[in-house]
Amino acid sequence: MKASRFFIGTLKEAPADAEIVSHKLMVRAGMIRRVAGGIYNYLPVGLRSIRKVEAIVREEMNRAGGIELLMPAVQPAELWQESGRWEQYGPELLRFKDRKDNDFVIGPTHEEVITDIARNQIKSYRQMPVNFYQIQTKFRDEIRPRFGVMRGREFIMKDAYSFDKDAAGLNESYRKMYDAYVRIFTRLGLEFRAVAADSGSIGGNFSHEFHVIADTGEDAIAYCPTSEFAANIEAAEALPLIAERAAPAEAMEKVATPGKAKCEAVAELLAIPLERTIKSIVLATDNEGAEPTIWLVMLRGDHDLNEIKVSKLPGLKNHRFATEQEIVEWFGTPPGYLGPVGTKKPVKVIADRTVANMSDFVVGANEVDYHIAGVNWGRDLPEPDVADVRNVKKGDPSPDGKGVIDICRGIEVGHVFQLGTKYSEAMGATFLDESGKPQPMLMGCYGVGVTRILGAAIEQNFDDKGIIWPESIAPFEVVLCPMGYDRSDMVRETADKLYAELVAAGIDVILDDRGERPGVMFADWELIGVPHRLVIGERGLKEGKIEYQGRRDAEATLLPADAAAATVAEKIRAALAR
């Protein structure tokens, strides 16, 4: 590729609405341009990287036995009504009517369509296992699109769907996809972790997320540095921090805590550790035609509620936070001084695992400006229902028993689910088993955010000059920067020869023949993030040398002119083989 025949749309300044590094650099490097909120044009530089991501994803999906197809972006509402997600999905699902007043959606995902294909095409157990995948544009009407391609409304995604006759087959399909994802993200040159996760709106029983590790990541990941344990903080099991409950050592006592509505303030006033205070959270579940059920969830003062865990408890799937009016009605006091002792009306109490093992703790007195100290289970309160309802913290014991938890930030770029029969039962996707009886197909779902990978890769690989692409997804692997290409026959002939040698070696090279000043050339290609650069100048050529600098190198080095192409080609091949 010659730069004079290519579009390079670099900018010196980032747009005012760009909040994170990847958004700023993708705009400045001429990769994307905004069309509307969360919707982007992908310019030639950006599209080259997208195509490289797609190629790696496609190769590994094919290697794992995936079969590519293409489903429509527009889907009829009837399919979503069959699955039940027409009502469940919410405003993120973009709905519209055609001229005949039929309801349609722009697909954010394709479980319904692929299940429709399967129920019409797969009739026998002999046709399974099968795994269909596509690489296609999706749309989710995010309430607040931001961060460029990281949280856009329109995006490119690879989604795959497996169909099996039994649980053993589903487990094998899941393992193949998990292994394929490990290969994909390894080949992309990214530091990543696979973490146990919640299945979210997709549904299902078992899932893992693949996260690119980055300080700017939206998701908190709990992991153990001394073992293989890793989980999204929403899904990580929180073990009790107290192995055995101590015997009571204090009498229960009502204490004045004027104006101290927070656990931290109460602990400071009473000169006790925060870990001895209790955070009381009031939830409600609605009952048709009757008053709501009120739940008091008790956490240690330094812990945070995990709503996803709560929603999986019996009776709490559709919980909400209680209103202040409800809190006053059941507890006789506004929030800030709530507790399980002496409630105005009966409530259901759930204690976190750690709280259940505490002694001599402090709770709200259900009276403004008062708390109760020295509270103990069994003596002052009945034994509670116990559940894991909190987020893990750094320093907690690892659930696998092999160390302690640490927390890092990650950007989700892939997700694998075991859906089971969620969609096949809802939509009647059955097959005839070995005995001729109809059975629901067992499904798996496997997604990779193609365009999101670009943003995540940049968040992990950049400096003050611009992007630092891994070789596998760089728009170009090497750039040739000739000094005076249009003025020096020696420079032009050498640059053209190097270009031909690199092309012949299968290297993705661009020759900058625009006639720009060296500073402009270097700034453009450092901003765009090309991993390798060769500078061809008359002075060096007279000594038989060409200047080489890797994008991560602090200094340039000199290479023999006749070996420069082979040397750089070998560096690129070695990087791609890692």
UniProtKB/Swiss-Prot annotation:
InterPro entries documented for this protein: aa-tRNA-synt_IIb (IPR002314), aa-tRNA-synth_II (IPR006195), aa-tRNA-synth_II/BPL/LPL (IPR045864), Anticodon-bd (IPR004154), Anticodon-bd_dom_sf (IPR036621), Pro-tRNA-ligase_IIa (IPR002316), Pro-tRNA-synth_IIa_bac-type (IPR004500), Pro-tRNA-Synthase_IIa_type1 (IPR023717)
Predominant place of localization: cytoplasm
GO terms of biological process kind: prolyl-tRNA aminoacylation
Q: Name one GO cellular component term.
A: cytosol
Catalytic activity from the UniProt record: tRNA(Pro) + L-proline + ATP = L-prolyl-tRNA(Pro) + AMP + diphosphate
Q: Where in the cell is it found?
A: Cytoplasm
* Record carries keyword ATP-binding: yes
Give this protein's Gene Ontology molecular function annotations: aminoacyl-tRNA deacylase activity; ATP binding; proline-tRNA ligase activity
Entry keyword set = Aminoacyl-tRNA synthetase, ATP-binding, Cytoplasm, Ligase, Nucleotide-binding, Protein biosynthesis
CDD domains for this protein: ProRS-INS, ProRS_anticodon_short, ProRS_core_prok
Kindly list the cysteine pairs connected by disulfide bridges.
Answer: none
Query: What's the Enzyme Commission number for this chain?
Result: 6.1.1.15
Summarize subunit and interaction data from the UniProt record for this chain: Homodimer.
Q: What is known of its domains?
A: Consists of three domains: the N-terminal catalytic domain, the editing domain and the C-terminal anticodon-binding domain.
Role according to the record: Catalyzes the attachment of proline to tRNA(Pro) in a two-step reaction: proline is first activated by ATP to form Pro-AMP and then transferred to the acceptor end of tRNA(Pro). As ProRS can inadvertently accommodate and process non-cognate amino acids such as alanine and cysteine, to avoid such errors it has two additional distinct editing activities against alanine. One activity is designated as 'pretransfer' editing and involves the tRNA(Pro)-independent hydrolysis of activated Ala-AMP.
List the PANTHER family hit by this protein, alphabetically. MITOCHONDRIAL RIBOSOME PROTEIN L39/PROLYL-TRNA LIGASE FAMILY MEMBER, PROLINE--TRNA LIGASE
* Protein family (similarity comment): Belongs to the class-II aminoacyl-tRNA synthetase family. ProS type 1 subfamily.
Protein name, per record = Proline--tRNA ligase
Q: What is the lineage of its organism?
A: Bacteria, Pseudomonadati, Pseudomonadota, Betaproteobacteria, Burkholderiales
The gene behind this protein is proS
